[in-house]
Amino acid sequence: MKNIAIIGASGYTGAQLTALIHAEAELTIQGLYVSENSLDKGKPLADLYPSYSHIALTLSPLSDDAKSKIVAEADAVVLATEHSVSLHLAAWFYSQGLAVFDLSGAYRFSDVAQYPKWYGFEHEYPEVLAKAVYGLAEWNAKEIAATKMIAVPGCYPTASLTALKPLVSLLTSAYPVINAVSGVTGAGRKAQLHTSFCEVSLTPYGVLGHRHQPEIATQLGQEVIFTPHLGNFKRGILATITVQLKPGTTTADVAAAYSVYAQAPLVTVKHNQFPKVDDVVLTPNCHLGWKFDENSGYLVVASAIDNLMKGAASQALQCIKIHFNL
């Protein structure tokens, strides 16, 4: 039995992960935490999320005493916190010997030079960063098992990389073009005008400047063009990706590349059949559908995930179970 502390449990991702861990026979929840300044401190989780009324846990402030209690009682800590907050908390808990599963972007780049540009801060813990593993569960299981610092991928990168990584040996130098739509939960729980009921509408954002673009490119080993879109639905991501493959590539070659997922229970791959967001919402699954034109050499692959599940909480749970061999 492994004991897990969840910090940032009041947000969509933290609450979703709480529900997932609560349902696991081999995991227990050491505690749920929010910042000392949070208006949610002291509230039962079910006050914020009535659908979790079966989870009788209260949100505690992350005081120094609480941090010491976590170190004494927990085997691992999950951080569903802002990037700049995770930066410091992850390094501290790692230094105390706990396994850290960070859902922010604070440890996703191995190159410290990326952080000022994409996250607005200098990375102060290069020695911890050097130990961090990118937690793309289907691809980095051995590394996840071997380290105590796991950077859980972003939602768009999870959808995109799951679709693209099998194709690496078939790609030309042409940039893959990724157009992806996410539900509004991807913007977080905080009230914002552009995600309010009357304002939300299908629109691109972060064009040629979203921080997930270099995350995808770094993990793929090739530059990409990535355009995210805000959709007028609650949860889910659909990424439609167009790539040029090497001359002479056949449909059979593409099918062989995607056979890498034959033993991956959470990834479904279909040829000439494309996924729907509704089919993956509230599941830990990724559905891929692809079609290849041998004459032009272009392939289109669509990837559907739940942004709060496979794109965040359920992938964190995958990483926890891989790390602890559960």
UniProtKB/Swiss-Prot annotation:
Disulfide-linked positions: none
One GO CC annotation: cytoplasm
InterPro entries for this protein: AGPR_AS (IPR023013), AGPR_type-1 (IPR000706), NAD(P)-bd_dom_sf (IPR036291), NAGSA_dehydrogenase (IPR050085), Semialdehyde_DH_NAD-bd (IPR000534)
GO biological process per UniProt: L-arginine biosynthetic process
SMART domains noted in UniProt: Semialdhyde_dh
Coiled coil regions in record: none
Cross-referenced Pfam families: Semialdhyde_dh, Semialdhyde_dhC_1
Catalytic activity, reaction form: N-acetyl-L-glutamate 5-semialdehyde + phosphate + NADP(+) = N-acetyl-L-glutamyl 5-phosphate + NADPH + H(+)
Keyword Cytoplasm: yes
UniProt keywords, alphabetically: Amino-acid biosynthesis, Arginine biosynthesis, Cytoplasm, NADP, Oxidoreductase
Primary subcellular site in the record, as a coarse category: cytoplasm
UniProt-listed Enzyme Commission number(s): 1.2.1.38
Listed pathway(s): Amino-acid biosynthesis; L-arginine biosynthesis; N(2)-acetyl-L-ornithine from L-glutamate: step 3/4
Highest taxon, organism lineage: Bacteria
Presence of the UniProt keyword Amino-acid biosynthesis in the record: yes
Enzyme class: oxidoreductase
GO molecular function, one term: N-acetyl-gamma-glutamyl-phosphate reductase activity
The family this protein is said to belong to: Belongs to the NAGSA dehydrogenase family. Type 1 subfamily.
Protein purpose: Catalyzes the NADPH-dependent reduction of N-acetyl-5-glutamyl phosphate to yield N-acetyl-L-glutamate 5-semialdehyde.
Descriptive protein name: N-acetyl-gamma-glutamyl-phosphate reductase
Phylogenetic lineage: Bacteria, Pseudomonadati, Pseudomonadota, Gammaproteobacteria, Alteromonadales
Gene name of this polypeptide: argC
